[in-house]
Amino acid sequence: MARVAGVDLPRNKQARIALTYIYGIGNPRALRILTAANVDPFRKIQDLSEDEVNRIRQVIEAEGQVEGDLRKDVAMHIKRLIEIQSYRGLRHRRSLPVRGQRTHTNARTRKGPRRGTVAGKKKATKT
């Protein structure tokens, strides 16, 4: 199993698909990496030589951030938005949609499960 950027790539998948298992690499970027490394995108990972895997590693390192560094960068950007108390930071803090979507209906994924009324709870009486 080839290990690239701290991720074990699945051996039985094509190289272009296997690279998308790395956080920060989608289909277009995977194809760009493979063409820069002179590797056939349709070859399976198990068929790649050690030299080809090393070339892929070098291209990924040169191309930009992936995996842990990218996750840390994204988290820092969100934390900065929260600290400067921007509107987007407020939406992140309240776990609401950030990019202008409606929330009256929908947005259940972002808002979480419904918090309905609690059965059996009575208000305190005045004495």
Swiss-Prot record:
Q: Where is this region: Disordered?
A: 93-127
Which UniProt keyword terms apply here?
A: Ribonucleoprotein, Ribosomal protein, RNA-binding, rRNA-binding, tRNA-binding
Recorded GO molecular functions are:
rRNA binding; structural constituent of ribosome; tRNA binding
Family annotation (Pfam families): Ribosomal_S13
Origin superkingdom:
Bacteria
Tell me if Repeat is a UniProt keyword of this record.
no
Q: Which GO terms describe its cellular component?
A: cytosol; small ribosomal subunit
The family database entries (SUPFAM superfamilies) matched by this protein are listed as: S13-like H2TH domain (SSF46946)
Q: State whether keyword Transferase applies.
A: no
Annotated GO biological process: translation
The entry's family comment says: Belongs to the universal ribosomal protein uS13 family.
- Biological role stated in the UniProt entry: Located at the top of the head of the 30S subunit, it contacts several helices of the 16S rRNA. In the 70S ribosome it contacts the 23S rRNA (bridge B1a) and protein L5 of the 50S subunit (bridge B1b), connecting the 2 subunits; these bridges are implicated in subunit movement. Contacts the tRNAs in the A and P-sites.
Share what the entry says about its subunit structure, partners included.
Answer: Part of the 30S ribosomal subunit. Forms a loose heterodimer with protein S19. Forms two bridges to the 50S subunit in the 70S ribosome.
PANTHER family annotated for this entry?
A: 30S RIBOSOMAL PROTEIN S13/40S RIBOSOMAL PROTEIN S18 (PTHR10871), SMALL RIBOSOMAL SUBUNIT PROTEIN US13M (PTHR10871:SF1)
Q: Per its record, how is this protein called by name?
A: Small ribosomal subunit protein uS13
The organism named in the record is Acidobacterium capsulatum (strain ATCC 51196 / DSM 11244 / BCRC 80197 / JCM 7670 / NBRC 15755 / NCIMB 13165 / 161)
Q: What is the lineage of its organism?
A: Bacteria, Pseudomonadati, Acidobacteriota, Terriglobia, Terriglobales
